[in-house]
Amino acid sequence: MKLFFRIVTLVAVVAMSLADMAPAWALTSRIKDIASLQAGRDNQLIGYGLIVGLQGTGDGFRSSPFTEQSMRAMLQNLGISTQGGQSNAKNTAAVMVTANLPPFASPGSRLDVTVSSLGDATSLRGGTLVMTSLSGADGQIYAVAQGSVIVSGFQAQGQAATVTEGVTTAGRVPGGAIIERELPSHFKDSVNLVLQLRNPDFSTAIRIADIVNGYASARFGGPVAEAKDSQEVVIQKPRTADLTRLMADVENLIVETDTPAKVVINERTGTIVIGSDVRVSPVAVSYGTLTVQVTETPQIIQPEPFSRGRTAVQPQTDIAAEQTGGRVAIIDGPDLRTLVAGLNNIGVKPDGIIAILQGIKSAGALQAELVLQ
């Protein structure tokens, strides 16, 4: 817990240091780092394939009959007869293969693919994905994938115990897909460029439009950009401009960024991320916990000798309850540093901090958006 508080405090100090320096040095970024081109979005690809070469960790044909059907169909396509009994070798696994086709990708380029088990395979480590076609939402084949599978997790199994670390039923094939079909692109024929902010914000959108208009006025003699809303900035193509060169110049312009105050909480992992612009109104916080411990200690009762009795188990339950009262802390926080210091003074665990932040938000004292994941 001490390590957690040290990390939170360190993040708070760094964030507040940046906030204190804001008047002299504002956070700036290139437009390419905070926005993307609407015409340059990714497209998702999907396919069904087989992974072979597994060391007894593949699908069982009885529980996953589709794996055997797929294997027989593949062998028949290769001209190999599949007449005979059922194989018991668990060295094949059926998988779903997914990939993202980047914008403007040309035939011959390579993609990373992700494979995920469909059947009861226990591990894909050491396997090889055989030739698998990847299709888009329109049903057209855009890439073909094949290669060795890399799995980050591991599994060790004995007769009486199994140890698993990470996920062994999913993996990646780096550069395993080759693009065979090019997506239709009308970028050169476009009359404007539409930039989409990755973190929508009206202030940032206006600043992007102003920076682009300053560049366009000096280069083309007039403004060309307009902020449509908090997410989109539309740039009209000047008559004498080439869109590719225009985009190359625009994406390298420097703009001052701004983000709304947010507190992001992941209740499953206990992760708390507090933005540097978070403000807290004066509020009093008290935190106490009730711990209930239930212990089962079954007692074995043996019968008397030669009594023809039976051994019985008598349940015995011990219940202990302990309630710890928390101190009351007055959090008068104009900044993030005061908020973190106030929570540390109470001495609560991460799950307690999550509950406190939710309570502060309900009381109307947290001047930020609370995001629960």
From Swiss-Prot:
Entry annotated with the keyword Signal: yes
Molecular function via GO: structural molecule activity
Pfam families (alphabetical): FlgI
Keywords: Bacterial flagellum, Periplasm, Signal
GO BP terms in the entry: bacterial-type flagellum-dependent cell motility
One cellular component term from this protein's GO annotations in UniProt: outer membrane-bounded periplasmic space
Subcellular location: Periplasm; Bacterial flagellum basal body
InterPro entries in alphabetical order: Flag_FlgI
Function noted in UniProt: Assembles around the rod to form the L-ring and probably protects the motor/basal body from shearing forces during rotation.
Similarity annotation: Belongs to the FlgI family.
The name this protein goes by in its record: Flagellar P-ring protein
Source organism of the structure: Rhizobium etli (strain ATCC 51251 / DSM 11541 / JCM 21823 / NBRC 15573 / CFN 42)
Gene: flgI
